[in-house]
Protein backbone atom coordinates (compact mmCIF):
# COMPACT_ATOMS: atom_id res chain seq x y z
CA UNK A 1 0.00 0.00 0.00
CA UNK A 2 2.85 2.35 0.82
CA UNK A 3 4.28 1.77 -2.64
CA UNK A 4 0.97 2.62 -4.29
CA UNK A 5 0.62 5.71 -2.11
CA UNK A 6 4.09 6.85 -3.09
CA UNK A 7 3.26 6.44 -6.76
CA UNK A 8 0.08 8.48 -6.43
CA UNK A 9 1.93 11.14 -4.41
CA UNK A 10 4.62 11.34 -7.07
CA UNK A 11 2.03 11.55 -9.86
CA UNK A 12 0.13 14.27 -7.99
CA UNK A 13 3.32 16.30 -7.59
CA UNK A 14 4.15 15.79 -11.27
CA UNK A 15 0.71 16.95 -12.41
CA UNK A 16 0.84 19.94 -10.06
CA UNK A 17 4.31 20.84 -11.31
CA UNK A 18 3.22 20.63 -14.94
CA UNK A 19 0.14 22.70 -14.10
CA UNK A 20 2.19 25.58 -12.71
CA UNK A 21 4.87 25.20 -15.41
CA UNK A 22 2.23 25.58 -18.12
CA UNK A 23 0.90 28.77 -16.55
CA UNK A 24 4.39 30.19 -16.11
CA UNK A 25 5.35 29.43 -19.70
CA UNK A 26 2.29 31.21 -21.08
CA UNK A 27 2.90 34.21 -18.81
CA UNK A 28 6.52 34.47 -19.98
CA UNK A 29 5.59 34.10 -23.65
CA UNK A 30 3.27 37.05 -23.38
CA UNK A 31 6.39 39.20 -23.15
CA UNK A 32 9.15 37.01 -24.66
CA UNK A 33 9.15 35.86 -28.28
CA UNK A 34 9.68 32.08 -28.37
CA UNK A 35 13.06 31.13 -29.87
CA UNK A 36 11.75 27.63 -30.62
CA UNK A 37 8.40 25.82 -30.58
CA UNK A 38 7.18 22.24 -30.66
CA UNK A 39 5.96 22.16 -34.27
CA UNK A 40 9.30 23.36 -35.62
CA UNK A 41 11.15 20.83 -33.45
CA UNK A 42 8.93 18.00 -34.67
CA UNK A 43 9.44 19.05 -38.30
CA UNK A 44 13.20 19.09 -37.75
CA UNK A 45 13.15 15.59 -36.26
CA UNK A 46 10.53 14.04 -38.56
CA UNK A 47 10.27 16.07 -41.79
CA UNK A 48 7.74 14.82 -44.39
CA UNK A 49 10.51 15.39 -46.95
CA UNK A 50 14.13 16.57 -46.83
CA UNK A 51 14.55 20.25 -45.87
CA UNK A 52 17.62 22.02 -47.19
CA UNK A 53 17.20 25.25 -45.23
CA UNK A 54 15.10 26.62 -42.38
CA UNK A 55 14.03 30.25 -42.64
CA UNK A 56 12.56 32.35 -39.84
CA UNK A 57 12.66 35.99 -38.74
CA UNK A 58 10.48 37.32 -35.95
CA UNK A 59 8.46 40.45 -36.65
CA UNK A 60 6.12 42.43 -34.41
CA UNK A 61 2.49 42.66 -35.47
CA UNK A 62 3.10 46.27 -36.55
CA UNK A 63 5.76 44.99 -38.98
CA UNK A 64 3.36 42.57 -40.65
CA UNK A 65 1.03 43.85 -43.35
CA UNK A 66 -2.57 44.32 -42.18
CA UNK A 67 -3.48 42.58 -45.43
CA UNK A 68 -1.89 39.34 -44.21
CA UNK A 69 -3.40 39.71 -40.76
CA UNK A 70 -6.86 40.05 -42.26
CA UNK A 71 -6.25 37.33 -44.87
CA UNK A 72 -5.35 34.78 -42.21
CA UNK A 73 -8.39 35.68 -40.13
CA UNK A 74 -10.61 35.45 -43.22
CA UNK A 75 -9.17 32.07 -44.16
CA UNK A 76 -8.80 30.38 -40.79
CA UNK A 77 -10.98 31.97 -38.12
CA UNK A 78 -13.45 34.72 -38.98
CA UNK A 79 -14.80 34.79 -35.41
CA UNK A 80 -11.32 35.31 -33.94
CA UNK A 81 -11.97 38.76 -32.50
CA UNK A 82 -15.09 37.66 -30.65
CA UNK A 83 -14.62 34.13 -29.34
CA UNK A 84 -12.83 32.98 -26.20
CA UNK A 85 -10.57 30.49 -27.95
CA UNK A 86 -13.11 28.00 -29.27
CA UNK A 87 -15.64 28.12 -32.10
CA UNK A 88 -18.43 25.93 -30.78
CA UNK A 89 -20.38 26.07 -34.04
CA UNK A 90 -17.36 24.83 -36.01
CA UNK A 91 -16.71 22.08 -33.47
CA UNK A 92 -20.34 20.97 -33.67
CA UNK A 93 -20.16 20.89 -37.48
CA UNK A 94 -16.93 18.90 -37.37
CA UNK A 95 -18.48 16.31 -35.05
CA UNK A 96 -21.56 16.05 -37.26
CA UNK A 97 -19.52 15.60 -40.44
CA UNK A 98 -17.20 13.06 -38.81
CA UNK A 99 -20.20 11.02 -37.70
CA UNK A 100 -21.25 10.87 -41.34
CA UNK A 101 -17.82 9.66 -42.34
CA UNK A 102 -16.84 13.03 -43.78
CA UNK A 103 -14.13 15.52 -42.85
CA UNK A 104 -14.47 19.23 -42.32
CA UNK A 105 -11.67 21.78 -42.02
CA UNK A 106 -11.78 24.85 -39.84
CA UNK A 107 -12.89 23.56 -36.42
CA UNK A 108 -9.66 24.82 -34.82
CA UNK A 109 -9.47 28.55 -34.12
CA UNK A 110 -6.34 30.65 -34.56
CA UNK A 111 -5.91 30.46 -30.79
CA UNK A 112 -6.00 26.66 -30.87
CA UNK A 113 -3.62 26.54 -33.82
CA UNK A 114 -1.18 28.86 -32.05
CA UNK A 115 -1.34 26.68 -28.93
CA UNK A 116 -0.78 23.54 -31.00
CA UNK A 117 2.19 24.98 -32.88
CA UNK A 118 3.78 26.31 -29.69
CA UNK A 119 3.30 23.46 -27.26
CA UNK A 120 1.88 20.32 -28.85
CA UNK A 121 2.82 17.33 -30.96
CA UNK A 122 0.94 16.21 -34.08
CA UNK A 123 -0.94 13.25 -32.59
CA UNK A 124 -4.73 13.34 -32.91
CA UNK A 125 -5.38 11.73 -29.51
CA UNK A 126 -7.94 13.02 -27.03
CA UNK A 127 -5.14 13.61 -24.53
CA UNK A 128 -3.36 15.94 -26.94
CA UNK A 129 -6.58 17.79 -27.74
CA UNK A 130 -7.27 18.18 -24.04
CA UNK A 131 -3.83 19.64 -23.34
CA UNK A 132 -4.19 21.88 -26.40
CA UNK A 133 -7.51 23.15 -25.05
CA UNK A 134 -5.84 23.92 -21.71
CA UNK A 135 -3.08 25.96 -23.35
CA UNK A 136 -5.66 27.69 -25.56
CA UNK A 137 -7.62 28.71 -22.48
CA UNK A 138 -4.46 29.99 -20.77
CA UNK A 139 -3.46 32.03 -23.81
CA UNK A 140 -6.91 33.57 -24.07
CA UNK A 141 -6.86 34.47 -20.38
CA UNK A 142 -3.29 35.79 -20.18
CA UNK A 143 -2.62 37.21 -23.66
CA UNK A 144 -4.64 39.66 -25.69
CA UNK A 145 -5.86 38.84 -29.19
CA UNK A 146 -3.14 40.90 -30.84
CA UNK A 147 -0.44 38.84 -29.12
CA UNK A 148 -2.09 35.58 -30.16
CA UNK A 149 -2.23 36.76 -33.77
CA UNK A 150 1.37 38.00 -33.64
CA UNK A 151 2.69 34.70 -32.32
CA UNK A 152 0.63 32.70 -34.80
CA UNK A 153 1.89 34.72 -37.77
CA UNK A 154 5.48 34.27 -36.63
CA UNK A 155 5.49 30.51 -36.03
CA UNK A 156 3.04 29.14 -38.59
CA UNK A 157 4.57 27.09 -41.40
CA UNK A 158 4.13 28.59 -44.88
CA UNK A 159 6.17 25.97 -46.71
CA UNK A 160 8.95 23.41 -46.18
CA UNK A 161 11.30 25.01 -43.67
CA UNK A 162 9.59 28.41 -43.99
CA UNK A 163 8.23 29.72 -40.68
CA UNK A 164 6.47 33.00 -40.13
CA UNK A 165 5.26 35.88 -42.25
CA UNK A 166 8.65 37.54 -42.78
CA UNK A 167 10.43 34.43 -44.04
CA UNK A 168 7.48 33.56 -46.29
CA UNK A 169 7.27 37.06 -47.74
CA UNK A 170 10.96 37.16 -48.57
CA UNK A 171 11.01 33.62 -49.97
CA UNK A 172 7.95 33.87 -52.20
CA UNK A 173 7.82 37.57 -53.08
CA UNK A 174 11.25 39.01 -52.30
CA UNK A 175 9.91 41.65 -49.91
CA UNK A 176 9.29 42.20 -46.22
CA UNK A 177 6.04 41.13 -44.60
CA UNK A 178 5.16 44.79 -44.07
CA UNK A 179 4.88 45.34 -47.84
CA UNK A 180 2.63 42.45 -48.80
CA UNK A 181 -0.27 43.28 -51.10
CA UNK A 182 -3.76 41.90 -50.63
CA UNK A 183 -3.26 39.43 -53.47
CA UNK A 184 0.05 38.17 -52.06
CA UNK A 185 -1.41 37.92 -48.57
CA UNK A 186 -4.36 35.89 -49.83
CA UNK A 187 -2.00 33.45 -51.58
CA UNK A 188 -0.07 32.85 -48.36
CA UNK A 189 -3.29 32.36 -46.39
CA UNK A 190 -4.64 29.99 -49.04
CA UNK A 191 -1.71 27.61 -48.53
CA UNK A 192 -2.07 27.37 -44.75
CA UNK A 193 -4.18 24.21 -44.57
CA UNK A 194 -1.25 22.23 -46.01
CA UNK A 195 1.77 24.35 -47.04
CA UNK A 196 3.70 21.25 -48.07
CA UNK A 197 1.03 20.42 -50.64
CA UNK A 198 -0.40 23.76 -51.73
CA UNK A 199 2.15 25.86 -53.60
CA UNK A 200 2.23 29.64 -53.32
CA UNK A 201 4.70 30.28 -56.15
CA UNK A 202 3.67 29.48 -58.74
CA UNK A 203 0.18 29.12 -57.28
CA UNK A 204 -1.82 26.04 -58.16
CA UNK A 205 -5.36 26.38 -59.48
CA UNK A 206 -6.66 25.46 -56.03
CA UNK A 207 -4.58 28.18 -54.35
CA UNK A 208 -5.74 30.74 -56.93
CA UNK A 209 -9.39 29.84 -56.38
CA UNK A 210 -9.09 29.79 -52.61
CA UNK A 211 -7.17 33.09 -52.56
CA UNK A 212 -9.99 34.68 -54.57
CA UNK A 213 -12.49 33.42 -51.99
CA UNK A 214 -10.28 34.77 -49.18
CA UNK A 215 -10.15 38.22 -50.79
CA UNK A 216 -13.93 38.21 -51.02
CA UNK A 217 -14.16 37.38 -47.32
CA UNK A 218 -11.64 40.13 -46.53
CA UNK A 219 -13.84 42.70 -48.26
CA UNK A 220 -16.82 41.55 -46.20
CA UNK A 221 -14.92 41.54 -42.91
CA UNK A 222 -13.30 44.92 -43.52
CA UNK A 223 -10.69 46.78 -41.49
CA UNK A 224 -13.08 46.92 -38.55
CA UNK A 225 -12.14 43.28 -37.87
CA UNK A 226 -8.51 44.19 -37.19
CA UNK A 227 -9.68 47.08 -35.03
CA UNK A 228 -11.70 44.62 -32.94
CA UNK A 229 -8.66 42.35 -32.63
CA UNK A 230 -6.50 45.20 -31.35
CA UNK A 231 -9.20 46.28 -28.91
CA UNK A 232 -9.99 42.78 -27.64
CA UNK A 233 -8.44 41.76 -24.32
From Swiss-Prot:
Keywords: Cell inner membrane, Cell membrane, Cell shape, Cell wall biogenesis/degradation, Glycosyltransferase, Membrane, Peptidoglycan synthesis, Transferase, Transmembrane, Transmembrane helix. Gene3D superfamilies: Biosynthetic peptidoglycan transglycosylase-like. The keyword Glycosyltransferase applies. The keyword Membrane applies. One of its GO terms (cellular component) is plasma membrane. It comes from the Bacteria. It is a single-pass membrane protein. Pathway: Cell wall biogenesis; peptidoglycan biosynthesis. It is found in: Cell inner membrane. GO terms for molecular function: pentosyltransferase activity; peptidoglycan glycosyltransferase activity. SUPFAM superfamilies: Lysozyme-like. It catalyses: [GlcNAc-(1->4)-Mur2Ac(oyl-L-Ala-gamma-D-Glu-L-Lys-D-Ala-D-Ala)](n)-di-trans,octa-cis-undecaprenyl diphosphate + beta-D-GlcNAc-(1->4)-Mur2Ac(oyl-L-Ala-gamma-D-Glu-L-Lys-D-Ala-D-Ala)-di-trans,octa-cis-undecaprenyl diphosphate = [GlcNAc-(1->4)-Mur2Ac(oyl-L-Ala-gamma-D-Glu-L-Lys-D-Ala-D-Ala)](n+1)-di-trans,octa-cis-undecaprenyl diphosphate + di-trans,octa-cis-undecaprenyl diphosphate + H(+). Its main location: membrane. Peptidoglycan polymerase that catalyzes glycan chain elongation from lipid-linked precursors. Belongs to the glycosyltransferase 51 family. This is Biosynthetic peptidoglycan transglycosylase. It comes from Shewanella oneidensis (strain ATCC 700550 / JCM 31522 / CIP 106686 / LMG 19005 / NCIMB 14063 / MR-1). The gene is mtgA.
